[in-house]
């Protein structure tokens, strides 16, 4: 792995500090920076660029590199271990004074309350050092990806913790906390605790560990990842006042349709500069060549690519929008034009760099169409549009465009696990439930069963994994809307079983699955130990729930890096889960989920219709944010060379 520094010369005079305006809504500016030309508006850009260059004392070496390479990255590199240092002739090597790293200062649990005013140290400012990370091998990428996963896990856990703390203060039926407000609070707390990624550098190009197609639900989450450094501005850039040569450089943009003159064509984007809008999102005055607008022009001049994140309206249980990382684009042209409202705006033509994975926004739109009109985008390959035959709340598609195999149609679909006869009769006398008419809350019997905390938030998201979750059952007085009734409501997201060259059969979702979201039950015919031994001797392959591994999710809900006095809750041990499931004749969609030691789905044991600790239901939850059309995977707790999916499906 290497990093290359942008050639910035500290001897050059910096320009005044340029503060980015909020996007898409900004305050109106009182003074115009220019008068709209009567003839060619594009001449304004040439004039502004010319004046900027004349006022800047460039060295001859720097001019030579800039004009010949059209790039801010030097072509000659000296290799020192894993760091690529630019040729000193370009003026790129800038001595940086070593400042001692500030110590992390975790909050106390009481600091999460808005009623507690705590004086916090001023967070460390972002670095002004621009680098590009190169030569990331598979193992390094895996480590970066794991670091991203853990950081996102802390962010999601903290955001939900803050939401639940406010809900406790407001009581059952009280005012709910604003999701975006707590998202910002969680981001700020992680910044104060030095948990933001890549804050010690500004990365140009790809962020190691962040993949094209990754989905985020809040702008602050983009900041935590280092993908986009400003929670409100649509253009993230290094300001001229921080740049050693006085030139701002853009590193990423958010395309959210906030400007009326934007034109998004997928691989090509006509991006409107920032500024000049009123509170209603209408262009109310001319834009100026400053801040992010100037940074975009400078990145175009030097050939520096920018990361593009698209913000899309997408109703879900977490927020009303999603942000999708769509990869790297180059700014190939810029001009000044008259916008739809008659005011001058800067426009930039962005073209996607070839050779990248398919854009996540395109996949998202494709999956939306599959849910409503699948044959319009996939005229061949669909075998059945509901293999559950109406037993699930939503249809389960079956798709195969590889061969003529239709095996999933030959099994009886089982929406829930079938337990041994008499189990429910034996347990009915021991049934006990809550009397929460409006839904479970503090002091509830079901809360006590779950070690003093309900396992889900008010959106039905799993707060943290437990050995066993007791959901409300038939003996409880709470309504179906109770937040302690999640898995018993059944399948809610659209799933598709598909033929795969790698795994035989696989499962993917047509919906966005956020971390902690319930997916479905893993259903089959439950067998006692004695029954399982007999079938095993006959050569039948069984599924053993106790073998499922969810070790990668054990840290979910651990906030010890943010809250100094946080104590991880302890839960009572449960008897070993000692039953098997036969799926040779009856099964559901979950049985086609592939095996992986790096899964994106976890197993959670749940009870709701009986009290036998020996026979919990096997429920599946998303272990991370899963984009549409991404294959789901489970860790079946078997060795890597073992046949995928326990040889169930092939």
Swiss-Prot record:
- Record-listed Zn(2+) 2 binding positions: 434, 446, 472, 476
Pre-SET domain mapped to chain residues: 432-490
Cellular compartments annotated:
Nucleus; Chromosome, Centromere
Q: Where is this region: Disordered?
A: 1-24, 95-129
Gene Ontology terms, cellular component aspect?
chromosome, centromeric region; nucleus
Record-annotated membrane-spanning stretches:
none
Null mutant phenotype reads: Impaired gene silencing due to decondensation of chromocenters leading to the derepression of DNA-methylated genes and transposable elements (TEs).
Q: Which domain of life is it from?
A: Eukaryota
* MF term (GO), any: DNA binding
All copies of domain SET, residue ranges? 493-637
| Keyword DNA-binding annotated | yes
Q: Which positions bind Zn(2+) 1? A: 434, 436, 440, 444
Binding-site list for Zn(2+) 3 = 440, 472, 478, 482
Q: Name one GO biological process term.
A: gene silencing by siRNA-directed DNA methylation
Where is it mainly found? nucleus
Keyword entries, A-Z: Centromere, Chromatin regulator, Chromosome, DNA-binding, Metal-binding, Nucleus, Zinc
Keyword Cell inner membrane among UniProt keywords: no
Q: Where is the composition biased (Polar residues)?
A: 107-118
Regions of biased composition (Low complexity) lie at: 7-20
Annotated ranges, domain YDG: 205-352
SMART domains per the UniProt record, alphabetical: PreSET, SET, SRA
Subunit structure, briefly? Component of an RNA-directed DNA methylation (RdDM) complex that contains at least MORC6, MORC1/CRT1, MORC2, SWI3D and SUVH9. Interacts directly with MORC6, MORC2 and MORC1/CRT1. Interacts with SWI3B, SWI3C and SWI3D.
Record text about domains: Although both SET and pre-SET domains are present, the absence of the post-SET domain may explain the lack of methyltransferase activity. Besides, the Cys residues in the SET domain that normally bind a zinc ion are not conserved. In the pre-SET domain, Cys residues bind 3 zinc ions that are arranged in a triangular cluster; some of these Cys residues contribute to the binding of two zinc ions within the cluster.
Summarizing the function annotation, the protein's role is: Histone methyltransferase family member that plays a role in gene silencing. Together with MORC6 and SUVH2, regulates the silencing of some transposable elements (TEs). According to PubMed:19043555, the protein does not bind S-adenosyl-L-methionine and lacks methyltransferase activity. Instead, it may function downstream of DRM2 in RNA-directed DNA methylation, binding to methylated DNA and recruiting DNA-directed RNA polymerase V to chromatin.
Q: Spell out the family assignment given in the record's similarity comment.
A: Belongs to the class V-like SAM-binding methyltransferase superfamily. Histone-lysine methyltransferase family. Suvar3-9 subfamily.
What is this protein's record name? Histone-lysine N-methyltransferase family member SUVH9
Organism whose genome encodes this protein: Arabidopsis thaliana (Mouse-ear cress)
């Amino acid at each position: 792995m290497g990093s290359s520094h942008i050639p910035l010369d500290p001897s050059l005079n910096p320009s005044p500090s340029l503060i980015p305006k909020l996007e898409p809504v900004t305050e109106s500016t009182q003074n115009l920076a220019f008068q709209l030309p009567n003839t060619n508006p594009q001449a304004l850009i040439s004039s502004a660029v010319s004046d900027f260059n004349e006022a800047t004392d460039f060295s001859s070496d720097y001019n030579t590199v800039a004009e010949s390479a059209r790039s801010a990255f030097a072509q000659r590199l000296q290799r020192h271990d894993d760091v690529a240092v630019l040729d000193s002739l370009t003026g790129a090597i800038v001595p940086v004074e070593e400042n001692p790293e500030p110590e992390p200062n975790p909050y106390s649990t009481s600091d999460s309350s808005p009623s507690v005013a705590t004086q916090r140290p001023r967070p460390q400012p972002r670095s002004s050092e621009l680098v590009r990370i190169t030569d990331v091998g598979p193992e390094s990428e895996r480590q970066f990806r794991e670091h991203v996963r853990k950081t996102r896990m802390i962010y999601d856990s903290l955001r939900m913790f803050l939401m639940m703390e406010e809900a406790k203060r407001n009581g059952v039926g009280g005012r709910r906390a604003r999701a975006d407000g707590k998202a910002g609070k969680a981001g700020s707390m992680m910044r104060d605790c030095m948990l933001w990624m890549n804050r010690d550098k500004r990365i140009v190009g790809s962020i190691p560990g962040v993949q094209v197609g990754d989905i985020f639900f809040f702008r602050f989450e983009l900041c935590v990842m280092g993908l986009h450094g400003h929670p409100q501005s649509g253009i993230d850039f290094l300001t001229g006042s921080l740049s050693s040569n006085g030139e701002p450089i853009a590193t990423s943009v958010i395309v959210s349709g906030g400007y009326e003159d934007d034109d998004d064509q997928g691989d090509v984007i006509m991006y409107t500069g920032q500024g000049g809008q009123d509170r209603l999102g209408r262009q109310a005055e001319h834009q100026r060549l400053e801040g992010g607008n100037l940074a975009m022009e400078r990145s175009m001049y030097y050939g520096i690519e920018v990361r593009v994140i698209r913000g899309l309206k997408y109703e879900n249980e977490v927020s009303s929008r999603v942000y999708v990382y769509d990869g790297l684009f180059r700014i190939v042209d810029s001009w000044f034009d008259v916008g739809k409202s008659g005011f001058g705006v800067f426009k930039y033509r962005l073209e996607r760099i070839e050779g990248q994975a398919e854009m996540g926004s395109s996949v998202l739109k494709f999956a939306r169409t599959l849910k409503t009109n699948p044959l319009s985008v996939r005229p061949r390959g669909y075998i059945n549009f509901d293999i559950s035959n109406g037993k699930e709340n939503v249809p389960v598609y079956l798709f195969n465009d590889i061969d003529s195999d239709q095996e999933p149609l030959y099994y009886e679909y089982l929406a829930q696990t079938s337990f041994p006869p008499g189990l429910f009769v034996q347990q009915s006398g021991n049934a006990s439930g809550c009397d929460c008419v409006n839904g479970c809350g503090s002091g509830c019997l079901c809360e006590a069963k779950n070690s003093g905390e309900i396992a889900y938030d008010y959106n039905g998201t799993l707060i943290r994994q437990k050995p066993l979750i007791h959901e409300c059952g038939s003996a409880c007085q709470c309504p179906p809307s109770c937040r302690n009734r999640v898995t018993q409501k059944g399948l809610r997201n659209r799933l598709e079983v598909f033929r795969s060259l790698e795994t035989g059969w696989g499962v993917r979702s047509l919906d966005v699955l956020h971390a902690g979201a319930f997916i479905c039950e893993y259903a089959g015919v439950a067998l006692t130990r004695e029954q399982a031994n007999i079938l095993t001797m006959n050569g039948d392959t069984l599924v053993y729930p106790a073998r499922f591994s969810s070790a990668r999710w054990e840290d979910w809900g651990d906030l010890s890096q943010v809250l100094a006095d946080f104590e991880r809750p302890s839960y009572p041990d449960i008897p070993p889960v000692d039953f098997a499931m036969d799926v040779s004749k009856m099964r559901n969609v979950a049985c086609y989920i592939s095996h992986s030691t790096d899964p994106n789905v976890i197993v959670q044991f749940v009870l709701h219709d009986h009290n036998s600790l020996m026979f919990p239901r096997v429920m599946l939850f998303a272990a991370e944010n899963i984009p549409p059309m991404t294959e789901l995977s489970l860790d079946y707790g078997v060795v890597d060379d073992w046949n995928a999916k326990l040889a169930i499906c092939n």
